Regions:
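His/Asp/Glu-rich, glycine-adjacent segments
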Residues: 52-194, 199-202, 328-377, 395, ...
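Active-site metal-binding loops of divalent metal-dependent hydrolases
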Residues: 10-11, 229-232, 404
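Short secondary-structure boundary/capping segments
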Residues: 20-24, 135-137, 190-194, 239-246, ...
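A structural signal for short, well-ordered beta-strand segments and their strand-loop junctions
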Residues: 8, 41-42, 117-123, 174-178, ...
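Active-site-proximal N-terminal segment of extracellular/periplasmic enzymes that hydrolyze or transfer
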Residues: 1-37, 47, 465
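Short, solvent-exposed loop/turn segments at the edges of secondary structure
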Residues: 48-51, 220, 237-241, 246, ...
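Active-site neighborhoods of enzymes that stabilize oxyanions during catalysis
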Residues: 263-440, 446, 450, 478, ...
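Metal-dependent active-site segment of extracytoplasmic phospho-/sulfohydrolases and closely related
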Residues: 6, 202-246, 252, 329-332, ...
Length: 502
């Protein structure tokens, strides 16, 4: 029987992970990698906790899942009555976190639904898990609240380790375990700080105990262990409170945690805190976004001028993006504009008056080619993720991307974030992938791990997911020639052999 253990170390930067490995501080992980492999992958956008877990656990991007961000507003139902409409102003950072499962599109299946013999530990995505298979749900709520206020993060990881080792003693085929301490310590102390090093060393000890148990039961060779992260991080030297910025322009603005505002003309939903979605005229229900041409009109926000032009002049803003009346996504920065379109199965980037994504000129490529072509770019894989952001009707009218070193919350960010994430910058989007099985040399997105895990477990891959089968660990282990697994519409039962099409 094959098993899969997906261990997510929240907020772990790949360069920090590699330095600790090279320094000899992670001996158990190092031993695992001698037979396995390690690489870097591009995460989902926005690069923030919970939302960026979706590619791992559904094989779909956040836009496909209909989850545009960790905070969002339902423009179709919000009428400006803050108490009656409070469910239309979503935040997975507080009491609404359990709503995430129901908010995911119904035709998107989690791995917990596809693999019934699953356990989730400290998971914000739990659809498909019974109470018995989500054993840490209460501890996650308690320790998560205490850690946020007290900066006491290690007890959460210790609880995760305890539940993980207990799950390993059972018969679960798939086990997901989220270790939150590295992210918590990164926000307050930095990505390469001593508290992060200590937390990562404790994860290494847990991996050693897990492998020791699997070796003692004769299961280690049939167990796939993946150590991943959902986002990176970068230092924050300046906080631009974006909601307060809109208020300073004379725009009544709704933003968490104060979500009541009389006759609001904007709603600012921050993620990470390096990006934000802005909804224009949120108290007027509608089903469609406003194009950027209308967002520029003074009467849209009631600011007395072109608020988009004023926004991109701010030093903290890398660029903004919105749909255009002429089609596609228009990107605006202080240095010029460009357009992203889809045509004949390719994503096209057309500089107009500038090159806001810093790609050096026009490019047209398939979605798979974009990840390789932009790997070392300032905003890797950005065209793919920008299109995905506007794939869901729940996303804002205007997407605001912060420059590295800046974020968009100040007054209500308690405790202060000295390091952050959530943007499209390389430091936020590139994440480590360590595996007990060899990994491909081709560039990966985190969403591509999903079909590989199902293939290892002998389950068919659902139709219509965004993850591509570029990594087939079971096939490689069995020494077969590289071929693609059959894609089917629903999960069904696991098979002894993965059906292959030639």
């Amino acid at each position: 029987m094959t098993r899969c253990f997906l261990l997510l170390v929240d907020g772990l930067r790949p360069d920090v992970a590699e330095r600790r490995l090279a320094a000899g501080d992670l001996p158990h992980i190092s031993a695992m990698l001698k037979q396995g492999g390690r690489t870097t992958a591009i995460t989902g956008f926005p690069s923030t906790t919970s939302v960026a877990y979706l590619p791992f656990l559904t094989g779909c991007t956040p836009g496909h899942c209909d989850i545009p961000s960790i905070r969002w507003l339902d423009r179709s139902t919000y009428t400006g009555r803050w108490w009656r409409d409070r469910k239309a102003v979503r935040s997975y950072c507080g009491y609404q976190a359990p709503m995430l499962d129901d908010d995911i599109r119904k035709d998107v299946q989690t791995i917990f639904e596809l693999v019934p013999e699953s356990v989730g530990i400290f998971t914000p995505v739990a659809r498909g898990l019974s109470r018995e298979r989500d054993p840490s749900r209460r501890e996650r709520q308690v320790w998560g609240s205490l850690a946020h206020v007290s900066k006491w993060h290690q007890p959460s990881d210790d609880a995760v380790a305890r539940h993980l080792l207990k799950a390993a003693e059972g018969s679960s085929r798939f086990v997901f375990a989220q270790f939150p301490a590295v992210d918590g310590f990164t926000h307050q102390s930095g990505a390469d700080s001593a508290p992060v090093h200590r937390a990562l060393a404790r994860v290494d000890t847990t991996v050693g105990r897990l492998r020791q148990h699997l070796t003692s039961t004769g299961e280690v060779e049939d167990s796939l262990i993946l150590i991943v992260s959902d986002h990176g991080a970068s230092a924050v030297h300046t906080h631009l409170d974006l909601a307060d910025w809109f208020r300073a322009q004379g725009v009544p603005t709704v933003a968490h945690p104060v979500v009541w505002e009389r006759k609001p003309r904007a709603a600012v939903m921050v993620a990470g805190n390096g990006s934000a979605m802005v909804y224009a005229r949120p108290g007027e229900p509608r089903n469609r976004r406003l194009p950027i041409e209308r967002l520029r009109r003074a009467q849209t926000f009631g600011s007395g001028g072109d608020i988009v032009a004023a926004l991109i002049r701010e030093p903290s803003i890398a660029f903004v993006a919105a749909e255009s009346e002429d089609g596609g996504i228009l990107i605006e920065s202080a240095t010029g504009s460009a357009r992203i379109t889809e045509r004949n199965g390719e994503i096209c980037y057309h500089p107009l008056s500038g090159d806001p994504l810093l790609l050096g000129g026009p490019q047209s490529a398939s979605a798979r080619q974009w990840v390789e072509a932009t790997w070392d770019a300032p905003y890797p894989d950005a065209p793919f993720h920008l299109l995905d952001q506007f794939r869901t009707p729940r996303s804002g009218d205007l997407l605001v991307i912060g420059k590295e070193g800046y974020d968009f919350r100040a007054r209500y960010e308690i405790p202060e974030h000295r390091w952050g994430h959530g943007s499209l910058t390389r430091a936020h989007m590139q994440t480590p992938v360590w595996s007990s099985q060899p990994l491909p040399t081709a560039p990966l997105r985190t969403v591509d791990l999903f079909p590989g895990m199902l293939e290892w477990l002998g389950y068919p891959v659902p139709d219509g997911i965004d993850g591509e089968p570029v990594w087939l660990p079971r096939e490689r282990r069995l020494g077969r020639a590289s071929r693609r697994p059959t894609v089917v519409a629903s999960a069904g039962q696991p098979t002894d052999e993965v059906t292959i099409t030639t």
